[in-house]
Amino acid sequence: MQTLNRRNFPGRQHPDRVIQFGEGNFLRAFVDWQLDLLNEHTDLDAGIVIVRPIDSDFPPALDTQDGLYTTIIRGLNEQGEAVREPRLIRSVNREINVYRQFDEYLALAHDPNIRFVFSNTTEAGISYHADDRLSDAPPVSFPAKLTRLLYERFCHFDGAADKGWVLLPCELIDYNGVALKELVLRYAAQWELTSTFTAWLNDHNTFCSTLVDRIVTGYPRAEVEALQQEMGYQDTFWDTAEHFYLFVIQGPLWLAEELRLNKLDLNVRIVDDIKPYKERKVAILNGAHTALVPVAFLAGLDTVGESMNDALIGKFVEKTIAEEIVPVLDLPHDELTSFAQAVLSRFRNPFIQHQLLSISLNGMTKFRTRILPQLLTYRERHGELPARLTFALAALIAFYRGERSGEGDALQAYPLQDDAHWLERYSTLWAGVKENTVSLAELVNVVLRDADHWEQDLTQVPGLAAQVTEQLQTIVERGMRAAVEGYC
């Protein structure tokens, strides 16, 4: 069987126009996949040079396949139909290891055609390392590496106004472009670089904050043999992802023309502020996940897909989103409902098996950040508590009992993953309930009164403790399926 490379699979190669910090699965199935579509269907003509920002030889460089690799995009489309789309990605030209090829790395700054810089160096990547120096080859932190490269470009082109870059970090932190620019300017000051360089950074480089959204499941280890037979070649870099994707860029409108987004209808939005889109994602996608997990798991289900195909639990999630989350968000209603429908399709994706227990990690913090804001806003706007969101809180408290109904009358124990503070507190409280020394009302009040966690005393929210206690009582006495019926 043939090996995937440009000799065996010749085709068009694009000039270097994009630098990408990060070689991982996400960027390859998200940014590179979109750029490859733009290269095929428009005149973008942008080749990608990947810079490996860490000192590691694992996995091997994409150079072993001349930059070629295959994406398998699969899931439910907008019509609810299962789709599967293999694609040979041809837009990556080469990969540079900055620790072993530092001169080649700096040479990228000398290329007048380079225009865009993408990155995904993990949430910890946009960080400050005090010991980084201009003379390091390379510096440790990603922002310092980038500052060194930008300074090289500034010097090589003598501060030319038309040689600035558009920088689009994809790290999962709020206002990632703002954070990255702040650190670049910090290094410029620390290294005592010229004021003209700082002015060039500010005036002729565009740092965009972004929001990225796609579940990338990466290398499909169990399917490799079948994929090789289907595609007719060996690929060490298969990359799988869901059908849905969204790229929100906080930046100038002229970006649409530069990236040729005006010539191909991709799910990319160029906006003035990404905050409403971040709130939408956290509230609808992440919030629905967090509400679903304890309800579905205590109802005897184990995966997100299985839960959404369960008539009772699926209806609970749909109504929670439509009636209690969407109405309190500040974006056009049609955008919110469209995104909500996409989320439901993503949850039902038959190609992804999301284990509920794995999503349950740090559930208390997730409830505070993902659901509590909508719960409190709903009460403020409607004068009553949202019954399904409070039920999700009752279910979460029940979940931390650490056991669910199994075969017959047997109880099935399961691992809990959270902060030690909560694990110890719940263990004590539920032991007290079992021994009849703590009532459910007392348990709920202890949990809601923890202002260090909730950033307020939730027992002061009128009716909340009583409603959650009543719902928890129903779950304990009747079981989750009987308890949730009233909310479907």
Swiss-Prot record:
One of its GO terms (cellular component) is cytosol. Coiled coil: none annotated. Its EC number is 1.1.1.58. Pathway: Carbohydrate metabolism; pentose and glucuronate interconversion. Belongs to the mannitol dehydrogenase family. UxaB subfamily. NCBIfam families: PRK03643.1. This is Altronate oxidoreductase. It comes from Pectobacterium atrosepticum (strain SCRI 1043 / ATCC BAA-672). The gene is uxaB.
